Structure formats: structure tokens, C-alpha cells
Swiss-Prot record:
The gene is rlmL. Keywords: Cytoplasm, Methyltransferase, RNA-binding, rRNA processing, S-adenosyl-L-methionine, Transferase. Specifically methylates the guanine in position 2445 (m2G2445) and the guanine in position 2069 (m7G2069) of 23S rRNA. This is Ribosomal RNA large subunit methyltransferase K/L. Its EC number is 2.1.1.173, 2.1.1.264. InterPro entries: 23SrRNA_methyltr_KL (IPR017244), DNA_methylase_N6_adenine_CS (IPR002052), RlmKL-like_Mtase (IPR000241), RlmKL-like_Mtase_CS (IPR053943), RlmL_1st (IPR054170), SAM-dep_methyl-trfase (IPR019614), SAM-dependent_MTases_sf (IPR029063), THUMP_dom (IPR004114). It is found in: Cytoplasm.
Length: 706
């Protein structure tokens, strides 16, 4: 009787125990990451040949205490290695774990290798060769605290390497994990199975091998036991011959049929080739198709199971498309697969919620380093009787109401960029902005008291509802996650797509970039202020400080300004401002662009202007600025400098985004200036729900000074 250990992915231990017991294993004991079991030689080889769930089968050789590297060396050397494999064979050591003395797995592996080589040298005066690639013998050493376990790896390469999958797509599932997903899905032998996002076909091939009674190890060419001195070649030949007979018979007798599709034709060709190598090609029909074209392959029956590992994104810009994909999949399942079962495996439970289906069972498992979930659904035989899940219903109703009102208003105003929703409901803390045919959803960073997964789920619900309410293709929605504006946050680069969109604002054409920066290049809340500046600037010299992308300069120029001067510290935004001016025919020396620290430039210029627009950051400590700037603290210093540049009958429009900003009216008066708040006049219909989005003032010379 052999004492053996089968390793597996975390979360699959119970399944593996049941599988080993079905093969005839005794005394099965679950530990984290595997199962200890007992069995004779036949069972040992059967477990290697037939286990669909094990990662490796190990034959323990020795356990011993390790308090030093010498203990490790002596414990390994105590094993009679020449009795295990011949000196003419190659070997490799896999070492995992550390303790206070063995702090590096590479060092541990080196000590083990030395002990094995020295064991041969002492007994035979010869040494075996170490081979990193496809060694004849693999020695596995696991160190935990002060205990080392040495085992012979009978598998060789991991058992998930069945031998049929030479080619894979971008994100392949390991075969043993795929087998576990199938076993947990509720799929029954003899019934059909479909995978609408099958990639290189692993789930379908594994299920077809189960249905046709094909041993998962039947196609493997290399094993870790064939160079073992105790290898029973005759018994192994008997077991593989028996497995071949069962596979041929199973292929003829199975009534299961399998259907796979994927949008990538190249991957579908890989899947077909993999199925041929696995010996199950005749059971699987593959098609290159988008999920949107998914149809029930057996509309007249019988019913079966849809099993898939749909894509999930780690990049923010992929999430709208994935949310739309899952939402569409849910609709197709309800409409066309009545009576079927559905089982999806994903690293994103939030995406699975976008199916708008209620799961009846849920399992957890690891896919490499990723925590994953598998959810099983029973699809109603009558689609009208399906139990759906309402997603963000309050948000959807509010957005629908806002859209009905604001779309009509925007058309009357002659604008195509406006805010549809701005954290109207506390549970859905996002802003939704329309830019022509596109929509930007910005999530404000949730408070630390809100559970991160709950916040992410709400965001996914918002995107799902937004796509539905606006009837929007997913590639027309841009998602951003941001904190409320602070200092120079708008200058942070998020991506490098370089995709610009030309939009209309009254009579101006303006370039926006919806993906690359935290902001888009157009502050929507200042729309009326820009319109006012255009009317104020006819025949005037106009100065735009902290100009960003120069949109105010465009309106001033179109309003008939004699000259525009646009000052900003960022070369990127000045180039953008130039692009905006050019789009409106505002070129020539009268339209200047100056790259400078605005505060320093103010202190060093004596130029005079009739209209000055300044929208400074609330706070700034840019590397290019020698001192910090706080708009509440420093606005009088700013006004003193601006007064020098302002002609007698000139006007300063001063705006900022600081909540609770208090203009020092006494200080303004002492400077010989007058300030009038015009915040209410600059707030448009789409920002009526957020009166604190900005504050705005007109500042002029006092009557005494004039």
C-alpha cells in the first residue's frame, strides 16, 4: 500500500477527494491544497491516468525537522536515492517554502540537489545530471516552519497538461480547473453543452472527454515515474490499453453534443486543432461568432447547460463593454435558452450581476492568484416566468427623468455637451455627461467607510442602467474614477489614446478628449461664463489666465475680441488651446499663447487688458511654482496683481471651485476694486442640482478709481 498526496487548486479539495474515492483510494484526508490518500500500485497509476482534478500526484519519501541548512542536507541524503532512480537519469528539484534558516527557495533547492548528488557519489562514485527542462525524475520538497517533506513527483509535468492543448488563447483555463467548473455546473452526462465564449475550447474538450469516458492522461507522452526504479511497466501498459478501449467505446456510445463559439476566428481554429488532438473533434461543433449572434443550437431540445468563463477586464476602459456583454448574454439566455442551465466562472462577481439573473448556487475557487466565483443559474422554461433582478432602478428612473428634460433643453440652447446626472442620489455617487454621441460616467471616489466591493457593484449597476436608459452602444461610454477636483488633478495623464472629438458649444467648435485625462478639456459648468465673456470681449483685449485648453479664449475671439492672450503652465494644454483656436479660424499674432507659471507671469508683466478671465485652482503646489497657492488665502494678492493689468473700464471675471469660498469684500474695497457675485447667472439648467459647482464674480475698478 502506498501513501500518496494529490495536490490541486485551492477550493477544489472536496471534489478531488470524491474523485479519488471513486477511483478506489482509501483513508482520504483533506488538507489545504490537496488530499492525502492510500492505495496500491494499480490505484496509484489509475490516479495519475484518470484524475481530472489533481495538479500532481506525489509519493512522499521522508519528513524531517530543519533547524539549519545542514539539517536539510542530511535529511535529504538519508534517503537511498540510488534505489529510487539510476545514475544515468536526469533530475530536477522543486523547492517551496522558507523558514528562519532557509530564507530562499533557490538556496534550499541547491542544498537538496547537492545532497542527492553526494548520495550517488558516495555509493557509486558517479553523479546524475541536473536537467531543468523535462527531467526524468522530479523531486518535490516542501518546507513549512521547521518541517521538511520530500516526495517523488510521479506526474512529471503538471497533470493539467493533458497533451492536447499546444495552442491557447490569451487567457486559458488550466484543464483541471476547467474539469472542476464542469463538475460543479450541474451538467449531466448525455446532455448537450454550449460555450459561447469558448476561446481555445478547454471547457468543451474537458466535458467531451468526460462524456466519452476518455482518460485525461491518455495523450500525455512524458511522466515522472517512467525513470523510477519501481516503475511497473506491465501494469501501466495494461491500464493504458484498458483506457484506450474505454475511450473508443465511449466515443461511440455518448449522446452528448457540444457547441462552441468565439468572436476570434484564429482562436476557433486553435480550438478545433486541440479537439482533434484530444480525440473528441467529432463531438464538438465550433463556430466563429459574436455573442450578439448567439442562438440556441438545439431549439427543439433536448435542453442542456451553457458553461463559460467570460472575459473580465482589469483595465477601467474595458468595463463598459464587459458590462454590456454580460447584460446582453443575460438577455439572450432568458430569451433563447429556456429550460437550460447556465454556469459562469469569473473573477468579477460584479460583472455576473449584470446578467440580471438570480443564481441558485455559488462556488469559490482560485484561478492562479485570482479569487474567482462560479455561479449556477436555472433558466426558466417560459421566458415570461423568468425571475429577473432589478438593477439600480432608482438611478435609472432619475436618469430617465433628467434625460427627457435636458436633451430638449440642450437642443434649444445649441449645445451638445451637458451634464445628465450629478450624484443626485446618495447611493449612486457619479456624474454622467453627454458629449455629442458619447457619454462619460465619472465615479467620485467613495468614502473609506463604504465597502469597496459594494461600491464597485453599484458602479457596475450604474453603467448597466446608463447603457439601457440611453440605448447606448458600450463603445460610446467612457468610464472614469476620480476624486473631487483638487489642485492640479486635472493635469494627470490617465491614458494615451490621443482620440479627440470635435463638439459644438453655441457658435464655438471645441476639441475634447474623453479618455486620456482626468478632465475632458471642457469644463461644462463654465459654459454660460464663456458665453458672457464672448459678449463682453467685442473690440477688447482679452486675457485668459490658468487657461487650461483655452475654451474661454475661443469664445472671446468669436465674440470679436481685438486680441486674446492665453496663459497656462502646461505645454500640453496650450497646444490643445491652439488647436481649439485654429478650429474656429482664430489664428495670427493677435491670438497669443504663453507657457508660464501664471502667478510669476502676472508679477512680471505690465500689459493692459480690458477683459480678464481667471479660474485658478483651489490649491496648487506645482514643481514649477516656487510657492503654494490657496485661492481662499491668496485671492486678495491675486486681485492686487490683476488690478495693475486692468484698464480703467475693464472687467475681471473671477471664478473658482472652492466650496464655501468667501470673497473678502472689505479687502477688495481697500484695493480700490468692486466685486459683484454672478454665480446664479452663470449656472445653467444641467447644473441646477449642484449650486456649489463653482462661484463666479465680476470685479471692476471702484467708482472713485474710475
Amino acid at each position: 500500500m502506498n501513501s500518496l498526496f494529490a495536490s490541486t487548486a485551492r477550493g477544489l479539495e472536496e471534489l478531488l477527494k470524491s474523485e479519488l474515492e471513486a477511483l478506489g483510494a482509501h483513508d482520504c484526508k483533506i488538507v489545504q491544497g490537496g488530499v492525502h490518500f492510500q492505495g496500491d500500485d494499480r490505484l496509484m497509476y489509475q490516479s495519475l491516468l484518470w484524475s481530472r482534478l489533481a495538479s500532481r500526484i506525489l509519493l512522499p519519501l521522508n519528513d524531517f525537522k530543519v533547524y539549519s541548512d545542514l539539517d536539510l542536507y542530511l535529511g535529504v541524503q538519508a534517503i537511498d536515492w540510488p534505489s529510487i532512480f539510476g545514475v544515468d537519469k536526469t533530475f530536477a528539484v522543486h523547492f517551496s517554502g522558507v523558514n528562519d534558516e532557509i530564507r530562499n527557495s533557490q538556496y534550499g533547492a541547491l542544498k537538496v540537489k547537492d545532497a542527492i548528488v553526494d548520495s550517488f557519489t558516495r555509493k557509486l562514485d558517479q553523479r546524475p545530471t541536473v536537467a531543468k527542462q523535462q527531467p526524468d525524475i522530479r523531486v518535490n520538497v516542501f518546507l513549512q516552519r521547521d518541517m521538511a517533506s520530500v516526495a517523488l513527483d510521479l506526474s512529471g509535468e503538471g497533470l493539467h497538461q493533458r497533451g492536447y492543448r499546444d495552442l491557447t488563447g490569451q487567457a486559458p483555463l488550466k484543464e483541471n480547473l476547467a474539469a472542476a467548473i464542469i463538475q460543479r455546473s450541474g451538467w449531466q452526462l448525455g446532455t448537450p453543452m454550449a460555450d459561447p465564449m469558448c476561446g481555445s475550447g478547454t471547457l468543451l474538450i474537458e466535458a467531451a472527454m468526460m462524456a466519452s469516458d476518455r482518460a485525461p492522461g491518455l495523450h500525455r507522452e512524458h511522466w515522472g515515474f517512467t525513470a523510477w526504479n519501481a516503475f511497473n511497466q506491465e501494469l501501466w501498459r495494461e491500464l493504458t490499453t484498458e483506457a484506450q478501449v474505454r475511450a473508443r467505446r465511449g466515443l461511440q456510445e455518448t449522446t452528448s453534443r457540444f457547441f462552441g463559439s468565439d468572436i476570434d476566428r484564429r482562436v476557433i481554429e486553435m480550438a478545433r486543432a486541440n479537439a482533434r488532438r484530444a480525440g473528441v473533434a467529432e463531438l464538438i461543433t465550433f463556430n466563429a461568432n459574436d455573442v450578439s449572434k448567439l442562438v440556441n443550437p438545439l431549439p427543439e431540445g433536448p435542453v442542456g447547460t451553457v458553461i463559460s468563463n467570460p472575459p473580465y477586464g482589469e483595465r477601467l476602459d474595458s468595463e463598459p463593454a464587459l458590462i454590456a456583454l454580460h447584460n446582453m448574454l443575460g438577455r439572450i439566455m432568458k430569451a433563447s435558452f429556456g429550460g437550460w442551465r447556465l454556469s459562469l466562472f469569473s473573477a468579477s462577481p460584479e460583472l455576473l450581476s449584470c446578467l440580471q439573473l438570480r443564481a441558485e448556487r455559488e462556488f469559490k475557487a482560485k484561478n492562479g492568484p485570482l479569487d474567482c466565483v462560479q455561479k449556477n443559474y436555472q433558466l426558466a422554461a417560459n421566458p415570461q416566468g423568468a425571475v429577473g433582478v432589478q438593477v439600480a432602478e432608482d438611478y435609472a428612473n432619475r436618469l430617465r427623468k433628467n434625460v427627457k428634460k435636458l436633451d430638449k433643453w440642450a437642443k434649444q440652447q445649441g449645445i451638445e455637451c451637458y451634464r445628465l446626472y450629478d450624484a443626485d442620489l446618495p447611493d449612486y455617487n457619479v456624474a454622467v455627461d453627454r458629449y455629442g454621441s458619447k457619454v462619460v460616467v465619472q465615479e467620485y471616489a467613495p468614502p473609506k467607510t463604504i465597502d469597496a466591493q459594494k461600491a464597485r457593484q453599484r458602479l457596475f449597476d450604474v453603467i448597466n442602467a446608463t447603457l439601457a436608459v440611453l440605448n447606448l452602444p458600450s463603445n460610446q461610454l467612457v468610464l472614469k474614477t476620480r476624486e473631487r477636483q483638487k489642485g492640479k488633478n486635472q493635469y494627470e495623464k490617465l491614458a494615451q489614446k490621443g482620440e479627440f472629438l470635435l463638439v459644438s458649444e453655441y457658435n464655438a467648435k471645441l476639441w475634447v478628449n474623453l479618455t486620456d485625462y482626468l478632465d475632458t478639456g471642457l469644463f461644462l459648468d463654465h459654459r454660460i461664463a464663456r458665453q458672457m465673456l464672448g459678449k463682453m470681449s467685442q473690440g477688447k483685449d482679452f486675457l485668459n489666465l490658468f487657461a487650461y485648453t483655452g475654451t474661454a479664449s475661443v469664445h472671446a475671439g468669436l465674440g470679436g475680441a481685438r486680441s486674446t492672450t492665453t496663459v497656462d503652465m502646461s505645454r500640453t494644454y496650450l497646444e490643445w488651446a491652439e488647436k481649439n483656436l485654429r478650429a474656429n479660424g482664430l489664428t495670427g499674432q493677435q491670438h497669443r499663447l504663453i507657457q508660464a507659471d501664471c502667478l510669476s507671469w502676472l508679477s512680471n508683466t505690465d500689459e493692459q487688458f480690458d477683459v480678464i478671465f481667471i479660474d485658478p485652482p483651489t490649491f496648487s503646489n506645482s514643481k514649477r511654482m516656487e510657492t503654494t497657492f490657496d485661492v481662499q488665502r491668496d485671492h486678495l494678492v491675486l486681485m492686487k496683481e490683476l488690478k495693475r493689468l486692468l484698464r480703467r473700464k475693464g472687467t475681471i471675471m473671477f471664478s473658482n471651485n472652492k466650496r464655501g469660498f468667501q470673497m473678502d469684500l472689505d479687502g477688495i474695497k481697500a484695493l480700490g476694486l468692486e466685486a459683484k457675485e454672478i454665480t446664479a447667472q452663470t449656472q445653467s439648467e444641467d447644473f441646477a442640482r449642484n449650486r456649489q459647482i463653482h462661484n463666479c464674480w465680476l470685479v471692476t475698478h471702484s467708482h472713485e478709481e474710475k
